[in-house]
């Protein structure tokens, strides 16, 4: 027993530290006492209800998130039970991401140094607070990080099972967050030659299964709502945020996310018409209002980089403790500066590693591509605080650790012990 504890002491310490920190933040901000349910959370609850109780699909939220969220319905759970389950799943994925980060960094760092890097995601306020909300960020981050873990294992072992699992996770992730679909398809394209060489092997079942789920989602949306699409959320997002803001800039008006006439009009339409109107408006503005579209995009990108966690702003002092407002202010300011720091670090270190794509498909270069893709994609939306960028923080930490390990000064203290 002692030998097992000694062998796995670092992962066990990681889990313990993560849970302790989660409880500390919970006590300071009264996270388990909050009753606010965000519109996105209501959407995810509704998608689970549609899948498990009505056997239909959701217009905005694809099937994988609905499947994960709604599992307790199989056991007669109430809606309140879904939120309790969400906390368990979020914490599992939140801890799992740091455990994977530790496993990956100890390949080129000593275990002690890898342990320090693996702890860093715990102390990003945004991801910790989001554990208490029915949202996708921590689940999505875990899926993508596990995908890259498998990709690095494939590079090390040349075992196609790892590549198959990696690509299947990426493809499945577009049924959690549809915005990742272009990155997932690009990754599949980059490894298409290898995939085609192995198309008859048993390990391809993972990729085939993911593709089948995507086809079911697309065909189901056509049958139920009228279009071959994964989700209608993309059109709503760029119409109501990016192009509505560009239209406001054009007409000299101040943009408001709430009470947005363009958004109200769009939501009055059928889902198929929402997609059509959003697409037509995007094309029209790109032709006639391009400078303001670029300005709106840059404005969104800057806002998503410099703002803190919106969920922290909304916490309420339910227990009337005297220290609450101070802790709330510190937590928000911390999340704001963490967003700025990790976004900037992630962007810079990703630029450093993405150069390798011109010579070889290294795991670091592909991870850097994901970080840059996510940051740049965030420009189509706004008003969500650090939610867009915090999914990149663990990847930025890994790339930073990798870069530091390659410097002579840091290498002396971090090279793993020879076995």
Language-model features and meaning:
Residues 18-20, 114-125, 149, 170, ...:
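Short helix- or helix-capping micro-motifs
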Residues 29-46, 56-72, 79-84, 228-231, ...:
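Extracytoplasmic catalytic/substrate-binding loops of multi-pass membrane glycan-assembly enzymes
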Residues 59, 63, 67, 75-99, ...:
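Loop-to-helix entry region of an early transmembrane alpha helix in multi-pass inner-membrane enzymes
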Residues 81-85, 293-375:
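Membrane-interface anchor segments at the N-terminal boundary of transmembrane helices
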Residues 88-108, 142, 146, 348-352:
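Transmembrane-helix motifs of polytopic, lipid-linked glycan transferases
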Residues 98-123, 141-142, 361-366:
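Transmembrane-helix signature of polytopic, membrane-embedded enzymes
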Residues 129-140:
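Short acidic/glycine- and proline-prone juxtamembrane loop motifs at membrane-interface regions
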Residues 225-318:
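Membrane-proximal stem/loop segments at transmembrane-domain junctions that anchor or position
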